[in-house]
């Protein structure tokens, strides 16, 4: 029962299926019937299916017959009509055939044309395809050509961009072509070529900025100079300005008289007029002198190529090398200012370029790198300056160098470089400048003193008088009232030295300009330098003149007068310094001027030299003495040499009336003392072994001549007998011997009021021995003459007593 | 004191201010030259010892101020001079014209037998010459005086001038000594007279 149920179920399903298949066969196109039929054979019911199919066929045939029977008459009618149509159709066929034959004949040309058209279209299609292909390839070729052009015209950065574009955008589209493969292979080479050429450009650039460093630096320094000039005009203080102008006017007045010691510096220190400023050329900037584009392009190229770090390292390395070259001073830099200027220009140019690159690139150079370079540059520059400036012996050059260094420092400061060490070094150079100035002024003073005529300055007109008074602060109402011609008491070197001291002060001040020192510092510095000038340089110059061999009394006397006036002028120099440095009068100066000491010392030296000079003249006369120590004759006048000597002294003191009173008195006293001492030595010297009373008489006449001179008052101002005291020793000795007053001498010896207080027993004995020897020599004759014997006995007695005195004095 | 010389000759330099008297003396005594003109005040002297015919001769050379204001003082030295040099400047005609005045001064104040000599100084400055050598020579001949052109700067003829004058003084002195000896031989009274004169050269010769 279950078996039958199952079979029934399967049969129903199959029947439905077969029904569906039959419907599909009836409705589906022939092309798709395959799958349908295959589904029948896939199963196992194709027999039953065939039965169903046969059944359906018979049904359909039966229906067809029914239909045919129903439509039989119509069918017959139709057949009849068809037979008619057949005839008509035959006619139509013939007609169509004719028409066709005609068309064929007529359309043969058209067919040919159509064939040609077909060929053309094919060709056109090919062309179009070719064009499409080429359209893909053409941009690549164009780009490559452009690349080549850019390489040729050395526009490497665009070339690199083109290369990148070509590689990543265009070539992938046409990578299967052989020529494209060749291009792809070439790209690395081209890239390397761009790299190399860019590096070459960079090297050229580096060479260019090295060559133009000098010009760039010069330009920057000029700009800084112009800026300073503008600042000076704005900040100019009326007081200083008018004072400087007054000084210039003074120079104009004395142009033919005063030789400027610093013409160049004087011009440098002048304040530019606004008109002059306007006339200046427009100074080009650094970027106008150098083309920086190569470095920018190269930087970009290396950045694109991924080698930026390599580029940065190379650039910095090369610039460090160039820095060392720039910082190497030429061996003869110190000889001229231009040597220094070129050196500074190169350094400034170098750093201006670096600063420019710092601000116009991203990271090629950084602040740390530049600061490191600058630190090296600063230490090397300072070392070089120390070395080379020490060779400078021209103060004008040192001053100009200082101005140049200040300008150098100011220029670099504007670009942000610290320059304090340069100003510190300038203070060192200032000391050297002072030394150089002192040497220069030593020469100046020497020239002034050597060329002076050591005579009072004569003036014949009011104009000349005012000129001298304008140069040197001298006021004398009495002299002013005197009629022309008249004379100033001092000689030419007084106003000249005074003016040169002021010039020295100006020169010191000039160095202090722009050093950012306070006026008090400047004032102290100037005073110290001026003290050195006065206490060392001028002092040495004066001493050298005073100690010079063959200097005459004329010069020495005038020097005394001159130094007196210069000493009085020191207070004016103090005022001059105070005015010139703008230090307030109330300020307590830590440094004072010591000029007065210098002039006092010089005056004392000159005075001493006068005494020495006079004494030397006296010695020369004494060398002419020709006493006949054995003469028996009694003369009646002084020796020739002594008369000449006294006449010389008399005339000397007579003509040097302008010698200060005390100096004249001291000189006269010194001369008399020297003369007295020399005469005494002459009398007592060992070479004179014997002498006679006659010789003593002659000697006495000479001493009297001296005393006469002393009494005559050759120099005013002496107390009545002060000068005579110089000869008192000689006088008493000679009186003792000539008057043979031994009893008085021996009796009174040691008494405070004795007549021969100044006669030394040793001296007396020495002289007595010389007389005894004389007598002893004539001993044989003396025996025959009672007087001679008595005299000899007396001499022996006195000698014995003198020896006793000497012995007791010693014990 | 032992004498270091045989004779003492006193010479005098006179002439206008600025002709070079001091420079001539400086050249002769120190062999140096000072370009700066320093006007002599009053009187000065230098001593130099020379040798003539084996004799040591001390030349005491007085240098006088040429300015008028010192005339009284300088004139006082004429009497003692044994030789006088009259100096003019060849570049200054006025100083040459004044030689006549200086000669007149000598005749008035110097001893009658003083030896004289004319010097035309600064002969190195030929480009500024105002007085020809011939004129100088003629003037000297007119007065029976020797003449030399000198240059203190270049030292031309300076030694020659002083030695010439000294030699002339020596010649005159020797002549006097010969005359004295001859007279002395004639009688003792004259010898005594000579000694009483006390002239320095005479006394030296006795020693």
Curated annotation (Swiss-Prot), chain A:
Residues 260-280 are annotated as: Disordered. Residues 50-119 form a coiled coil. The keyword Coiled coil applies. Keywords: Coiled coil, Disease variant, Dwarfism, Exocytosis, Protein transport, Transport. GO terms for biological process: exocytosis; Golgi to plasma membrane transport; intracellular protein transport; membrane fission; mitotic cytokinesis; vesicle docking involved in exocytosis; vesicle tethering involved in exocytosis. Pfam families: EXOC6_Sec15_N, Sec15_C. Component of the exocyst complex involved in the docking of exocytic vesicles with fusion sites on the plasma membrane. The exocyst complex is composed of SEC3, SEC5, SEC6, SEC8, SEC10, SEC15, EXO70 and EXO84. It is linked to Spondyloepimetaphyseal dysplasia with joint laxity, 3: An autosomal recessive bone disease characterized by multiple joint dislocations at birth, severe joint laxity, scoliosis, gracile metacarpals and metatarsals, delayed bone age and poorly ossified carpal and tarsal bones. This is Exocyst complex component 6B. It comes from Homo sapiens.
UniProtKB/Swiss-Prot annotation, chain B:
Its cofactor is Mg(2+). CDD domains: Rab8_Rab10_Rab13_like. It is a lipid-anchor. InterPro entries: P-loop_NTPase, Small_GTP-bd, Small_GTPase, Small_GTPase_Rab. The keyword tRNA processing does not apply. The keyword Hydrolase applies. The modification Cysteine methyl ester is found at residue 204. Its main location: membrane. GO terms for molecular function: GDP binding; GTP binding; GTPase activity; signaling receptor binding; TPR domain binding. GO terms for biological process: antigen processing and presentation; cell-substrate junction organization; endocytic recycling; exocytosis; positive regulation of cell projection organization; positive regulation of corticotropin secretion; protein import into peroxisome membrane. GTP binds at residues 17-23, 35, 39-40, 66, 121-122, 124, 152-153. Pfam families: Ras (PF00071). A lipid is attached at residue 204 (S-geranylgeranyl cysteine). Regulated by guanine nucleotide exchange factors (GEFs) including RAB3IP/RABIN8 which promotes the exchange of bound GDP for free GTP. Regulated by GTPase activating proteins (GAPs) which increase the GTP hydrolysis activity. Inhibited by GDP dissociation inhibitors (GDIs). The modification Phosphothreonine is found at residue 72. It is found in: Cell membrane; Cytoplasmic vesicle, Phagosome; Cytoplasmic vesicle, Phagosome membrane; Endosome membrane. Phosphorylation of Thr-72 in the switch II region by LRRK2 prevents the association of RAB regulatory proteins, including CHM, CHML and RAB GDP dissociation inhibitors GDI1 and GDI2. A motif (Switch 1) lies at residues 31-45. It is an enzyme of class 3 (hydrolase). The modification Phosphoserine is found at residue 180. Belongs to the small GTPase superfamily. Rab family. The small GTPases Rab are key regulators of intracellular membrane trafficking, from the formation of transport vesicles to their fusion with membranes. Rabs cycle between an inactive GDP-bound form and an active GTP-bound form that is able to recruit to membranes different sets of downstream effectors directly responsible for vesicle formation, movement, tethering and fusion. RAB8B may be involved in polarized vesicular trafficking and neurotransmitter release. May participate in cell junction dynamics in Sertoli cells. This is Ras-related protein Rab-8B.
């Amino acid at each position: 029962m279950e078996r039958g149920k199952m079979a029934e179920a399967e049969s129903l399903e199959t029947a439905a299926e077969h029904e569906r298949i039959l419907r599909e066969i009836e409705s589906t196109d022939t092309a798709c019937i395959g799958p349908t039929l295959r589904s029948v054979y896939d199963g196992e019911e194709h027999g039953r299916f065939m039965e169903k199919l046969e059944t359906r066929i018979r049904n359909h045939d039966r229906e067809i017959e029914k239909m045919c029977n129903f439509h039989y008459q119509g069918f017959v009618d139709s057949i009849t009509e068809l037979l008619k149509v057949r005839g008509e159709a035959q006619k139509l066929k013939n007609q169509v055939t004719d028409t066709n034959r005609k068309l064929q004949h007529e359309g043969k040309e058209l067919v040919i044309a159509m064939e040609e058209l077909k060929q053309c279209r094919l060709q056109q299609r090919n062309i179009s395809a070719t064009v499409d292909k080429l359209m893909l390839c053409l941009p690549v070729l164009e780009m490559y050509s452009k690349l080549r052009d850019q390489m040729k015209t050395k526009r490497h950065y665009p070339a690199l961009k083109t290369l990148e574009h070509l590689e990543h955008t265009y070539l992938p589209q046409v990578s299967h072509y052989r020529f494209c493969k060749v291009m792809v292979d070439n790209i690395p080479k081209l890239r390397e070529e761009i790299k190399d050429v860019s590096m070459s450009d960079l090297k050229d650039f580096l060479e260019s900025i090295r060559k133009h460093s000098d010009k760039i630096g010069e330009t920057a320094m000029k700009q800084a100079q112009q800026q300073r000039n503008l600042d000076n005009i704005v900040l100019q203080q009326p007081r200083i300005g008018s004072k400087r102008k007054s000084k210039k006017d003074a120079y104009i007045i004395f142009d033919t008289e005063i030789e400027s010691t610093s013409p160049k510096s004087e011009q440098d220190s002048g304040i530019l007029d606004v008109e002059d400023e306007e006339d200046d050329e427009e100074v080009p900037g650094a970027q106008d002198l150098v083309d920086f584009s190569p470095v920018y392009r190269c930087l970009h190229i290396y950045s694109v190529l991924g080698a930026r770090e390599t580029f940065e390292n190379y650039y910095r390395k090369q610039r460090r090398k160039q820095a060392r070259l720039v910082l190497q001073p030429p061996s003869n830099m110190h000889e001229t200012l231009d040597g220094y200027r070129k050196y500074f220009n190169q350094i400034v140019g170098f750093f201006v370029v670096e600063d420019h690159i710092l601000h116009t690139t991203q990271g090629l150079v950084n602040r740390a790198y530049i600061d490191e370079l600058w630190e090296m540059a600063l230490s090397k520059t300072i070392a070089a300056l120390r070395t080379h400036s020490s060779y400078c012996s021209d103060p004008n050059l040192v001053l100009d160098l200082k101005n140049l260094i200040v300008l150098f420092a100011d220029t670099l400061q504007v670009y942000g470089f610290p320059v304090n060490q340069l100003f510190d070094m300038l203070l060192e150079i200032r000391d050297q400048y002072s030394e150089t100035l002192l040497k220069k002024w030593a020469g100046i003073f020497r020239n002034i003193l050597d060329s002076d005529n050591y005579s009072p300055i004569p003036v014949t007109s009011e104009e000349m008088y005012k000129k001298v008074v304008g140069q040197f602060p001298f006021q004398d109402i009495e002299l002013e009232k005197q009629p022309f011609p008249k004379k100033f008491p001092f000689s030419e070197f007084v106003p000249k030295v005074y003016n040169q001291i002021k010039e020295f002060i100006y020169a010191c001040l000039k160095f202090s300009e722009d050093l950012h020192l306070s006026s008090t510092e400047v004032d102290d510095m100037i005073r110290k330098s001026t003290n050195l000038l006065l206490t060392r340089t001028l002092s040495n110059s004066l001493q050298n003149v005073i100690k010079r061999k063959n200097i005459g009394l004329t010069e020495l006397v005038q020097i005394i007068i001159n130094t007196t006036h210069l000493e009085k002028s020191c207070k004016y120099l103090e005022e001059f310094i105070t005015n010139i440095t703008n230090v307030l009068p109330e300020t307590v100066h830590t440094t004072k001027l010591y000029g007065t000491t210098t002039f006092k010392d010089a005056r004392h030296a000159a005075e001493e030299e006068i005494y020495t000079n006079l004494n030397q003249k006296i010695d020369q006369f004494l060398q002419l003495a020709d006493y006949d120590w054995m003469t028996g004759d009694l003369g009646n006048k002084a020796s020739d040499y002594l008369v000449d000597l006294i006449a010389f002294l008399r005339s000397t003191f007579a003509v040097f009336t302008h010698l200060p009173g005390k100096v004249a008195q001291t000189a006269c006293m010194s001369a008399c003392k020297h003369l007295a001492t020399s005469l005494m030595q002459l009398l007592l010297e060992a070479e004179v072994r014997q002498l006679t009373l006659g010789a003593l008489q002659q000697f006495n006449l000479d001493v009297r001549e001296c005393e006469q001179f002393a009494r005559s008052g050759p120099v005013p101002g002496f107390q009545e007998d002060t000068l005579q005291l110089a000869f008192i020793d000689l006088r008493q000795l000679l009186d003792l011997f000539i008057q043979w007053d031994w009893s008085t001498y021996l009796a009174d010896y040691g008494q405070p009021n004795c007549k021969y207080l100044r006669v030394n027993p040793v001296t007396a004995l020495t002289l007595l021995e010389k007389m005894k020897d004389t007598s002893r020599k004539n001993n044989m004759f003396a025996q025959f003459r009672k007087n001679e014997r008595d005299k000899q006995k007396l001499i022996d007695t006195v000698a014995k007593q003198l020896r006793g005195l000497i012995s007791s004095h010693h014990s | 004191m032992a004498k270091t010389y045989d004779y003492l000759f006193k010479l005098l330099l006179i002439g206008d201010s600025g002709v070079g008297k001091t420079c001539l003396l400086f050249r002769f005594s120190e062999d140096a030259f000072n370009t700066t003109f320093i006007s002599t005040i009053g009187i000065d002297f230098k001593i130099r010892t020379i040798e003539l015919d084996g004799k040591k001769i001390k030349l005491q050379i007085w240098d006088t101020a040429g300015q008028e204001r010192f005339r009284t003082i300088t004139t006082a030295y004429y009497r003692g001079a044994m030789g006088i040099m009259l100096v003019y400047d060849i570049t200054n005609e006025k100083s040459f014209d004044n030689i006549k005045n200086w000669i007149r001064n000598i005749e008035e104040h110097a001893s009658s037998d003083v030896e004289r000599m004319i010097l035309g100084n600064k002969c190195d400055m030929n480009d500024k010459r105002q007085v020809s050598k011939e004129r100088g020579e003629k003037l000297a001949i007119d007065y029976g005086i020797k003449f030399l052109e000198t240059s203190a700067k270049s030292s031309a003829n300076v030694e020659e001038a002083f030695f010439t004058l000294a030699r002339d003084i020596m010649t005159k002195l020797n002549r006097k000594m010969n005359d004295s000896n001859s007279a002395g031989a004639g009688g003792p009274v004259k010898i005594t007279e000579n000694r009483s004169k006390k002239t320095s050269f005479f006394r030296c010769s006795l020693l």
